[in-house]
Amino acid sequence: MKFIVDQQVEDIEMPENLKLNTFLKEFHSVCPHSECSFGLYGFAFGQSPFPVPLLMQEALMKNANQGAYAPVPGIPELRNAISKYNKHYFGMDIAPERIYVGPGTKELIFNLLEILHGTVILPTPAWLGYLPQIRLLKKNYHMLPTNTNKKISPIDLKKLSLRLQDRQKILILNNPNNPTGLLHNRLELEEIADVCREQNITVISDEIYAQTTYDFSKFVSMGKIYPEGTFITNGLSKSHAAGGYRLGYVIFPQHAVDLKRQFKKILATEYTAVSTPIQYAAVAGFEISKEIDIYFDATRSIHQIMGEYTYNALSAIEGIKATKPDATFYLLADFNAFATELQKVKINTSQKLSEALIVHPYHIAIVGGDSLVLERTDFSARIAYVDYNGTKVLQNYFDNKPKTSSERIEFVKNNAPKVVAGIEMICTFFKNLRKESLNDLQTQKKKV
C-alpha cells in the first residue's frame, strides 16, 4: 500500500541539529580515514553538558510509582513551586493559576501559536525551531532582521507592524538569545514594549536561557515590563540541564481568563498532561534551595568562562567576527569576510559551508546561517561551546575555581580540549581556504 503524506508536512525540513546527527552517522560510516573514528568538534549541539541536579534525580526515583494522570495544567505542587521560583529569581508575583505546564517549552510555544490569532513577527537570526512550527501551523509571518548589533530595533519593529493589517500581531522574543548569546537589557525591553502596546503586539517571551545570564542581576523578564501582553515560557532544559525530562511552563497574562480555558482545551486534546513522575522531579528543581543556588552559580560561571574563551579565540582569527555572549552557551560567528574565497571553491551557501567544515580533515560541526533564518548566502554560524564532560568539569570547578584571567584560560584548555582544538581547526580551515585562493590567483597570473 502506498501512503500519501500531507503536503504541509512534506514541506517542513528536519531541524538542522537533528539532520546533522543523521549526516554524521552516514559520514563516519563511509569515511576511509582513521582520524574519522575520533568523532567531531561538536559546535552544533545546544545541550547543557552538566548532570541533572541530584535532588531532582532523587525525587524522580522516589515518585516512579506515580502512575495516575496529572491535572492538565500541572500538579498543584509544581505550579506553586514555579510561582515561588519566579518570585525569588525574577521578582514577579505570579498566581499559580496563571501557570500551565507542558512537555517542554518547544511544545508550549507551538500550542500558543495554535490559539493566538495574528501574523507572527520573527526576529532574525533565530532559534532553528520557530519557523518550522509557524509553517506547520500555516500562520502568516514576517521576518524582522535585527540591527547591526544583532538586537531588535524598536523603530524597525514599528515600521513592520504598521505594514501589517492584523488587529493582533505576535512577536517571538527570545531573551537571552539563541543563537547570539546576547541579552536585551531593561531599557531595550521597555522600548520594545512601548511599540507593542501602541501596535497591539502580543509577545511570546522565550526565556529558557534566563538562568544562564552571566551577570544574573542584568536579566529582566519581559513579563515585568509588559505584563498585560506577554506570555512567558521557561523550563528545565537549560537551567537544570534536564532537556530529556521534557518539562516546561508558560505564564499567562493576568487577565487572559478565556484564553486559559482555550489553552487547556488544546493541551487536553494533544497530550493530556506531562508525565506525573517528571512533574514531581520538577518540583524539587523549582523549589528554592541552597543546593540549586550553588548549581546555578557554578554552571553559569562555567558557561561564561567557556564563552569568553570561545569569543576571544574566534575574534583573534583575522576575518572572523563574533557576538560577545551575555548568556547561554552560544555565540554567532560571522565568516562573511571570506565570501569571495568561499565562492571561488563553489561554497556559495551557508549549507555548503557547513558541509565543507564537517568533512575530513576538519570534522567541525556547526549550525549554518540558513538554519538560523538568515539568507542562504549569509556565511554566519551558531557556535555552541559545550563539547566537554560536564560532570567532570563541574567537579573540577568546585575543586579549584579559576579566579584570574590566565587561570580561566587554563581551565578551558584543561577541561574542554575539544573546544580549544575545534577553534584551532576552524582557523586551519580558513587559512587553507585563503592559501588555496591565493594559489588560484597566482596560477591565473601565470596563464596571462
Q: What is each of the regions a protein language model found here?
A:
Residues Q343-I347, A356-A365, S371-V448:
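PLP-dependent enzyme catalytic core of the Aspartate aminotransferase-like
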Residues V283, D297-E308, K321-E341, F379:
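Conserved glycine-rich beta-strand-loop-beta hairpin in the small C-terminal domain of fold type I
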Residues D6-P103, I288, G390-K392, E410, ...:
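N-terminal small-domain helix-loop-helix segment of the aminotransferase-like
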